[in-house]
Amino acid sequence: MKQFVASDIRNFAIVGHGASGKTCLAEAMLKIGGEINRLGTIEDGSTTSDYHPGERSRQISIHSTPLHMEWMDKKFNMIDTPGYSDFIGEALGSLSVVDMAVITIHAVNGVEVCTETMWNHASKLGIPKMLVVNGLDREHTKFEKVLEQARKRFGNNVFPMQLPVNEGPGYNKNIDVLRSELISYKEDRSGQMTESELPEELKERVKDLHEELIEYVAESDDSLLEKFFEEGSLTEEEMREGIHHAIQNQTFIPLFCVSATSNIGVARVCDFISKYGSSPDDRKTIIANDEKGSDVDVSLDGSETVLQIFKTMSESHVGEFSLFRVYSGKVSTGKDYHNTNRNINERFGQMFILNGKNRTQVDQLSAGDIAGVVKLKDTHTSNTLCSGKHVTLPALDLPSPNIHAAIEPSAKGDEEKLAVGLSTLHEEDPTFIYRVDSEVKQTIISGQGELHLTVTTERLKRRFGIDIALEEPKVPFRETIMGSGSAKYRHKKQSGGAGQFAEVWMRIEPKQRGEGIEFTHSLVGQNVDRVFVVSVEKGVKTACSDGILAGCKVVDVKVDFYDGKMHPVDSKDIAFQTAGKHAFREAFLSAQPCLLEPIMDIEVKVPEDFMGDIMGDISGKRGKIMGMDADGSFQVIKAQVPQAELYHYATTVRSLTGGRGIHSESFSHYEKMPKDIEKKVAQERQKQEDE
């Protein structure tokens, strides 16, 4: 395999909203790059990147897929990413390791929610962006409207490098603004084209656009700007260097016109990426932490190896497969590298560059490149491996889950298989999280949306043979008291032979929220042997764990065991545990008991037009609006809402906003529940126990 220096590598992610043509654009690139012989299609499940069963059956991308090709003596490392927010972690993880974002826009639908999400994340990461309007051969396309929308959302410096001449069915002609020429494409999906002079009616507009482009390029560099003011133009070489510089500074955002399924306009996109796109050379250093936690620079030109795992896959015939990017030094088969996150050494076996499920073996990789390695023992997504000095790169910036469900295997005895399956799927997709909640006695899975969780359950069945059902998670309500109470409880049991006897006198009072259970004793005299204090405490802890009102954990109570009675023969540990448990129960019921419910902090980011609907829905969920902030064309609504009201809230937000809203949630505090709802919860829990 040919070795490429960093300046000849182009690492980019193809991102955008679902169904905006990302996979088809990648497929067309592979076709003109000679990596495939024919264009696959979404409909017949034959594209290179969507090769997993779930992707083919649903006709959407679910996984990020690395691809590669050569174009104009440059190596393209492309990552085709999912566009639906349920699988956003795949796209965000990919953006973290590339040098450029190619953002697709649907030629009919225009800028959509995940278009904006990807734009914002690429901006946050500081990587250059370019836009590709795809599907211009469809009915009802309105290029000028899409261009206007892109400028409104992303800035007036969005600049059309091309203009479609005959958009809609039969589309096969573009104006190349940079070269001021007409390009006509063959309609056989070959991508072949002919160049000719501009039509007379378009010359004036293209002239104006070309001059505007020169101004953008000049603004990116002081020396070019000075020459532009002096001479009024730039040479072709100055334009070439200036465009690259302008792309890095995002002085302007290039926008291209294509129909990927017809292979129209794709070659010029590749030309532009090859000539002007970002290379690893454009960001030679990345910040890492040394062993003391101090910031250090990792240089592209460094001799010591530093790489990061950005995705883990599990393949049936090879086991785990780790995708990585090299940030410094070289990586070679058979060499050992130190995992600084887990403090272990890993020997690198076979390495491959990939086009979907097709692999080409490589023995060595240089800084700036991307590849995969098989069968690392204990290395996971986001981990850093290095030689020489031990450094750790920042973890990938991935979103927190916003939807949760409880699961249970349909067949008894599948618990061990389920644990293995959940662990494997989490390693492959860190935005999928699972935990065993001992408080509500359920296994809870969390993800980015209903489809995310549904696809995960399908993968558990297909790969591990486990059938599971999704159900609403139980809410971890808590029980406490609002006042003081006391009780005297005698436990006496006689059934022939040794009996049981214990009497416990107890008083309780409320503590501040979050202070937990405090058990004390104030015994005086010899009524109760002090050895039984621990027994009473065990009984109290059992009562607190089992719950009293609704079978929920008891919190924030001070307990004082102040007196009691014992029998010289029949008093024993189990007797005082039982008496302690029942004394606490009676005292609790006399102390104004109540239920507490978890309150969540939520942030909902929506276009201004949808604020009223979202705020009304929050109020209907017993929520409190805590504030609002502007974020560009969006509003961020901050609120506190009971957890019990938030099941499927991610779906509600998408429904209310036409898919343009997103939300995040995190635990805030516990709060007293309204009496009418408390009564319903207690009755429901009692019903569940009776069943």
Regions flagged by a language model, labelled:
Residues 1-691:
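Structural and coupling elements of P-loop NTPases
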